[in-house]
Regions:
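Loop/turn elements at helix/coil->beta-strand transitions in domains of secreted/extracellular proteins
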Residues: 21-22, 53-56, 92-93, 101
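Structural signal for short hydrophobic segments within the conserved structured cores
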Residues: 21-23, 39, 104
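Structural recognition of the beta-strand scaffold that forms the well-ordered cores
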Residues: 23-24, 58, 232
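Acidic Gly/Asp/Thr-rich repetitive segments characteristic of extracellular carbohydrate-active
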Residues: 27-66, 81-82
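Extracellular beta-strand/beta-solenoid scaffold signature
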Residues: 72-84, 111-121, 143-153, 167-172, ...
Length: 242
């Protein structure tokens, strides 16, 4: 049943508009290219700058070693590697997905902003669909009580996160009607925070900061070998379905 749900959501979300544009990102791409299958972009940042509602970004397989100078934004507390602030619509989602059966991997080993929490995908946009990729080696640089996250949903509504593997977890504070489907969060530990004990990293954190942030769901997700909780709802001000 999980597979059928995922496939139907993918076709509803990513292939609804036949007039939409498809962009491609590849490890051997170049951001001066046109972003086509034959001439792909090199970075997700470039593709994100081009998309409009209904578009799909196909990420080719391979390992993408992200550099610190590629970070898109941040604030006094956080560094945003990919700032996903563009929104789709109910009828035309924006999709970011691994291409066909390929499995892209985003490696964050080199992103270590001093004194900042790392949010690899900082998602404030709505009606987005993220599918079929992996995020590894998300770094923690603060020795106090803290953590970093692979995905941080901060204000985005009606987003779908599907078939993702995350080595530093998922975190939601603001947003409604977001679906996390068939995702894995595992081996989440860092040797830096908590004065070197690294015991504060969860697999999935569902912490809606307001009673109005309703309709959020973890479905078919797995969490294991995490240094803190597999699923943490300790600060949730609204019901969260698991």
């Amino acid at each position: 049943m999980k597979k059928h749900i995922g496939i139907s959501l993918f076709f509803m979300g990513c292939f609804l508009s036949l007039s939409a544009t498809n962009y491609f990102v590849a490890t051997n791409g170049d951001d001066s290219n046109a972003g086509t299958l034959d001439k792909p972009f090199a970075t997700l940042q470039k593709a994100q700058s081009k998309v409009v509602p209904g578009d799909t970004v196909y990420i080719r397989g391979g390992e993408y070693r992200i550099r610190e100078e590629q970070m898109m934004g941040g604030d006094h507390l956080r560094a945003y590697v990919f700032e996903m602030n563009k929104s789709g619509t109910q009828a035309k989602r924006i999709c970011y997905t691994g291409y066909q059966d390929e499995r892209p991997i985003f490696n964050l080993a080199e992103v270590k902003p001093e004194g900042k929490r790392v949010s690899v995908f900082y998602v404030s946009g709505s009606y987005l669909h993220f599918r079929n990729f992996e995020i590894i080696k998300t770094q923690v640089t603060i020795r106090e009580h803290t953590q970093s996250e692979c995905i941080y949903n901060q204000g985005g509504n009606h987003n779908i996160y599907e078939n993702l593997a995350m080595h530093d977890g998922f975190y939601l504070v603001r947003g409604s009607h977001n679906l996390v489907l068939n995702c894995d969060a595992y081996n989440n530990y860092d040797p830096v925070s908590e004065n070197g004990t690294g015991g504060n990293v969860d697999g999935f954190g569902g912490h809606p900061a307001s009673a109005s942030y309703t309709g959020n769901v973890f479905k078919g997700c797995r969490a294991w070998y995490n240094s803190d909780d597999g699923f943490d709802l300790i600060k949730a001000q609204a019901a969260y379905t698991i």
